[in-house]
Amino acid sequence: MFTLKKSLLLLFFLGTINLSLCEEERDADEEERRDDPEERAVQVEKRILPILAPLIGGLLGK
C-alpha cells in the first residue's frame, strides 16, 4: 500500500510539473502573438468569419 501511495504521489508531482511547464509555454506564445499585429489580425479573422459566413449566406438566399 505504501508503494502505491508513493507511486501515485510521484505521478501527481510529475503531472503538476508538466502542466506548469505547458502553461508557461502557452503564456509565452500568447504574449508573442499579441506583439505581432499580423497574428492579431489573423485571430480576429478566425473569430469573425464563422459568425459572418451564415449571415451572408442567409442574405444571399443560399
Swiss-Prot record:
Expressed by the skin glands. InterPro entries: Frog_antimicrobial_propeptide. Residues 23-45 form a propeptide. Keywords: Amidation, Amphibian defense peptide, Antibiotic, Antimicrobial, Cleavage on pair of basic residues, Cytolysis, Hemolysis, Secreted, Signal. It is found in: Secreted. Disulfide bonds: none annotated. The keyword Ubl conjugation does not apply. Pfam families: FSAP_sig_propep. One of its GO terms (cellular component) is extracellular region. Residues 1-22 form the signal peptide. GO terms for biological process: defense response to Gram-negative bacterium; defense response to Gram-positive bacterium; hemolysis in another organism. The keyword Secreted applies. The modification Leucine amide is found at L60. Belongs to the frog skin active peptide (FSAP) family. Temporin subfamily. Antimicrobial peptide. Has low activity against the Gram-positive bacterium S.aureus (MIC>100 uM) and the Gram-negative bacterium E.coli (MIC>100 uM). Has weak hemolytic activity against human erythrocytes. This is Temporin-CDYb.
